[in-house]
Regions:
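Residue-level detector of conserved catalytic or cofactor/ligand-binding positions
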Residues: 391-397
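Acidic, metal/ion-coordinating pockets
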Residues: 21-307, 349-355, 359-361
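Bacterial Sec-dependent N-terminal signal peptides
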Residues: 1-23
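A short C-terminal boundary segment appended to hydrolase-like catalytic domains
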Residues: 287-387
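Short, compositionally biased low-complexity segments
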Residues: 29-36, 173-175, 325-337, 389-390
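Short glycine/threonine-rich loop-to-helix capping motif typified by GTGT followed
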Residues: 224-230, 382-389
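Ser/Thr-centric signal marking residues that sit
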Residues: 32, 366, 397
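Residues marking helix boundaries in flexible regions
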Residues: 5-8, 28, 392
């Protein structure tokens, strides 16, 4: 009888030992991209409620963190510093207070960010100040300091979650010189994404030995050469041609995408893009099975999630109510009066008071001899009456 009890006890211990060596880890990866200043669920230009925003995104994040706790990884993929007066005000008007964007992202507890071309377009004084006040690293493996030949920003971030090592590699579209004047990015250069990815993947594998590698790329998937030499949207090329990535989070092109592709090594890579303005977010579930601390299998599933369905975070709105009121006052300030309404529509057929105004302003402000301007919108209108400072929308590339 004692012998039988001993055997059962031994078997029980063996089962416990095996169970202790095997482990399942579940991660939730959330990507935002191309938020374009849509921090609040309100469009300060149209003066209407907005479907997207960080306020709605945070409501989703709060709910998911109840389940995933620290295993939720929150990442931003750039182009967050331009698009609404909220960004403009803290970029150029109030440069003394902490930048609203970094305050919000710190409050939301982002794990890493990435640079986008519209962030670069704000100028080094703005984006360097923003980066300095972020509690998380803003990445840029292919943004090179020309004086040192080294990345101006951290190339990647290592995250440890529940015994799993995750590496996030950040890159930006290298086509910046095709759009932006050098005075905005003086002292920097933007290297090819695929070449940069090969270099850093080798370093990451040798130095970090990660269990999961995420590409955080401010670039779309339709590759073509800008100005004959800049491969603007190389995310798909990197996913396919540089083995090692499990997930590639995309941005820049404002195009929704979620699919798996096969790389040259025969491995599956999830590529996903949440488009723009915080209307949807990239929602990725990763399940890893570990044995003796080593990953035996990975299951990666992604979907695009509409943020409107999750409502607006009351905590977020309460925390940033004073800044909301500050921006409202700014955009409500009268800066002039139009005695007649003007529209872009006539510009497509002949003389246009709207385009004449743009030419006059460009010539007067810059001192240029010649002004070029395009209507861009077919039927944009400035109506007769007072003009408010909400006209400051963006500094478009």
């Amino acid at each position: 009888m004692k012998r039988i009890g001993f055997i059962y006890g031994l078997l029980f211990c063996l089962v416990l030992s095996v169970a202790a060596q095997e482990k399942v880890v579940k991660l939730k990866i959330v990507e935002t991209s191309d938020v374009h200043g849509n921090y609040y669920p309100y469009n300060f230009i149209t003066r209407h409620e907005w479907k997207g925003s960080l306020a709605r995104i945070y409501s989703f994040v709060q709910k998911e963190r109840e389940q995933y706790k620290e295993n939720l990884i929150l990442l931003d993929n750039g182009d967050i510093l331009q698009g609404q007066p909220t960004a403009y005000y803290y970029n150029y008007i109030d440069t003394v207070s902490p930048h609203l964007c970094s305050e919000m992202m710190n409050f939301m507890k982002y794990d890493a960010g990435n640079m986008g071309n519209h962030d670069v377009e704000t100028g080094r004084a703005v984006f360097d100040r923003w980066i300095a006040t972020c509690d998380f690293p803003v990445l840029g493996a292919n943004i090179i300091d020309t004086s040192t030949g080294k990345p101006h920003l951290a190339p990647y971030k290592v995250l440890e979650r529940d015994g799993v090592k995750i590496v996030v590699l950040g890159m930006i579209t290298p086509a910046i010189p095709a759009w932006l004047s050098e005075n905005l990015w003086k002292g920097l250069r933007f290297d090819d994404m695929e070449e940069t990815a090969r270099k850093w993947m080798r370093i990451i594998r040798e130095k970090e030995n990660p269990d999961l590698v995420i590409g955080l790329f401010h670039a779309g998937q339709e590759a073509f050469k800008m100005s004959g030499k800049y491969n603007e949207n190389a995310s798909l090329n990197v996913a396919k041609n540089v083995p090692g990535f499990d997930i590639v989070l995309m941005g820049h092109d404002h195009a929704r995408e979620c699919k798996k592709v096969m790389n040259v090594a025969g491995d599956s890579v999830l590529i996903i893009d949440p488009a723009s303005n915080g209307i949807v977010l990239s929602n990725v579930d990763v399940t890893l099975k570990l044995k003796d601390g080593k990953v035996q299998s990975k299951d990666i599933k992604g979907e695009l999630t509409e943020t409107e369905a999750y409502g607006i975070s009351e905590d977020f709105m309460k925390r940033f109510a004073p800044q909301y009121e500050t921006v409202q006052k700014f955009v409500s300030k009268k800066i002039g009066t139009f005695t007649e309404s003007i529209s872009t529509h006539p510009a497509f057929f002949g003389p246009s008071a709207f385009i004449d105004l743009i030419h006059t302003l460009q010539l007067d402000i810059t001192g240029a001899d010649i002004s070029f301007a395009a209507p861009l919108s077919f039927d944009a209108e400035i109506k007769k009456g007072d003009v408010l400072s909400l006209i400051h929308i963006s500094e478009p590339t």
